[in-house]
């Protein structure tokens, strides 16, 4: 299972680097395009998260992998 987590982490890092890398001479991405990419990445991270909690409008992931029914993350502190 550790290899799968490592593979997913490397894939997301490569995807993130590819989407935001700008070669010299290229025009910057439009705001709409950047917002769409950010939304897709956030959606992927939420799908991979097994313990997603929101507190006072701030949502955070508290664990990747493992059982969704039995999260092993620490409790949310204020």
From Swiss-Prot:
Signal peptide region: 1-21
Compartments reported by the entry: Secreted
Record keyword Signal present: yes
One BP term from GO: defense response to fungus
GO CC term (a single one): extracellular region
Keyword field: Antimicrobial, Fungicide, Plant defense, Secreted, Signal
Chief location bin: secreted
Sequence similarity: Belongs to the DEFL family.
The protein, known as: Putative defensin-like protein 288
